[in-house]
């Protein structure tokens, strides 16, 4: 059983209950971009499960293109790796979730101007394209999450959070300048951390645990105006693990296709060697697995919204 979240946290969430709901359209292709926070969303999948449960007949396509250590101005890839714009066109992206600011925050106040400029340029570039062939993508800029104070042997969380606060504010400013939706996870998560003493949400002060992903998925749903139930918060393990496992399997197939362990044999200088001869065909087979997994998700009975977070 999961522990109750405090009443104070409920009150803090109350301000979000009037948030304008994010537009989710039938058949939307949703792509998640960003750093380790983004990449790890596929491990537990609570937010994606929520989307399918909230819009059970929309046949949503979700692709996690998060890459650990990515920064808005620096996304290091193997030689020959496809350009981001080409990938987004292949996925016909309608809605983008951008998760940046945490890694950049280590530059402190001196790096703020550079971050804001690069973020603005990135948003402008994305808004100038129509990956779906019809319109510019809708964009949600997601703030970094705070450090969690869990161990005296880890870096000072207060100092780190002062930096992250600067970059969260900077992200919000740039989002407003470009007419992009901003989702603040920093403030409510910091509030949660200060009011929960018996349940940690990260494994190391930075990366979310399964419980943390479960809790943050609720923050995201409320912050996007997609979940307005303020009567109570769930306290139990989710009932329908079968669907969440299916989401994980689809994401695993995609991740091993898109981000293979040794991409040099696919995109780089070794893609003509004997060992790489059959990889192109195997990748096509993997794409078929991704599509089949997605069709299976669409056909499955979706968990009720109360079951996504295990309310009892």
Enumerate the language-model features and the residues they cover.
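Structural recognition of the beta-strand scaffold that forms the well-ordered cores
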Residues: 29-33, 61-66, 94-100, 138-143, ...
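Active-site segments of SGNH/GDSL-like serine hydrolases
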Residues: 99-105, 126-164, 186, 195
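Conserved catalytic region of serine esterases and O-acyltransferases that act on ester linkages
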Residues: 42, 200-312
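Extracellular serine-dependent O-acyl
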Residues: 135-144, 162-199, 214-237
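Solvent-exposed loop/turn segments at secondary-structure junctions
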Residues: 36-40, 67-73, 95, 102-107, ...
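Serine-esterase "nucleophile elbow" of acetyl-processing enzymes
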Residues: 8, 18-68, 84-92, 96, ...
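Oxyanion-hole/transition-state-stabilizing segment in secreted/luminal serine hydrolases
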Residues: 33, 44-45, 53, 67, ...
């Amino acid at each position: 059983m999961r522990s109750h979240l405090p009443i104070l946290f409920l009150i803090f969430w109350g301000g979000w209950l009037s948030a304008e709901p994010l537009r989710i359209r039938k058949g939307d292709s949703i792509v998640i971009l960003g750093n380790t926070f983004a990449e790890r969303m596929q491990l537990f999948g609570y937010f994606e499960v929520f989307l399918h449960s909230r819009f059970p007949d929309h046949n949503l396509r979700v692709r996690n293109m998060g890459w650990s250590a990515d920064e808005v101005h620096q996304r290091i890839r193997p030689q020959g790796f496809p350009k981001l714009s080409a990938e987004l066109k292949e996925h016909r992206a309608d809605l983008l979730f951008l998760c940046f600011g945490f890694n950049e925050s280590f530059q402190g106040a001196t790096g703020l101007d550079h971050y804001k400029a690069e973020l603005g340029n990135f948003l402008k570039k994305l808004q100038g394209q129509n990956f779906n062939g019809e319109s510019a993508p809708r964009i949600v800029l997601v703030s970094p999450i705070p450090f969690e104070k869990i161990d005296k042997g880890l870096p000072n969380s207060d100092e780190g959070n002062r930096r992250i606060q600067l970059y969260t504010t900077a992200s919000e400013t740039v989002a407003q300048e470009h007419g992009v939706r901003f989702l603040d996870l920093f403030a409510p998560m910091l509030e949660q951390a200060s009011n929960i003493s018996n349940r940690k949400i990260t494994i190391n002060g930075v990366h979310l645990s399964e419980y943390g992903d479960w809790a943050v998925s609720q923050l995201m749903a409320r912050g996007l105006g997609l979940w307005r139930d303020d009567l109570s918060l769930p306290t139990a393990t989710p009932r329908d693990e079968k669907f969440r496992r299916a989401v994980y399997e689809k994401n695993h197939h995609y991740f091993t296709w898109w981000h293979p362990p040794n991409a040099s044999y696919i995109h780089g200088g070794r893609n003509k060697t004997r060992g790489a001869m059959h990889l192109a065909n195997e990748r096509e087979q993997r794409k078929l697995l991704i599509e089949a997994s997605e069709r299976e998700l669409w056909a499955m009975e979706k968990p009720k919204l109360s079951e996504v977070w295990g309310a009892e």
